[in-house]
Amino acid sequence: MDKVATAAYVYGVVQGVGFRYSTQRQAAQLELSGYARNCDDGSVEVVASGEPHAVEMLIEWLKQGGPRSARVDKVLIEPHGKTDYKGFTIRY
């Protein structure tokens, strides 16, 4: 099956609560590649690449609130063109 890549922009209380690291662990369990990074507007950008079902599962996890320490108010999703990431990293 072909890989897909999706960018998710997660808004709410998502910085300073371990959100990127929890997302990295969840992505690794789903065998996804990509990255998570804090944005200047207080959101977190998550780019995930891999099997379509696994990407959907990560997006659903994000929408359900991610880690317990976070509060997710909304998640905006858009397609992302690049699929050839090596592992899932935290970007600064």
Curated annotation (Swiss-Prot):
Keyword list, A-Z: Hydrolase
Residues in Acylphosphatase-like domain copies: 5-92
EC number: 3.6.1.7
InterPro entries: Acylphosphatase (IPR020456), Acylphosphatase-like_dom (IPR001792), Acylphosphatase-like_dom_sf (IPR036046), Acylphosphatase_bac (IPR028627), Acylphosphatase_CS (IPR017968)
Keyword tRNA processing attached: no
Sample GO molecular function, one term: acylphosphatase activity
SUPFAM superfamilies: Acylphosphatase/BLUF domain-like
Catalytic activity: an acyl phosphate + H2O = a carboxylate + phosphate + H(+)
DNA-binding listed as a keyword: no
Catalytic residue list: 20, 38
Transmembrane segments: none
PANTHER family in the record: ACYLPHOSPHATASE
Family, similarity comment: Belongs to the acylphosphatase family.
Name recorded for this polypeptide: Acylphosphatase
Encoding gene (name): acyP
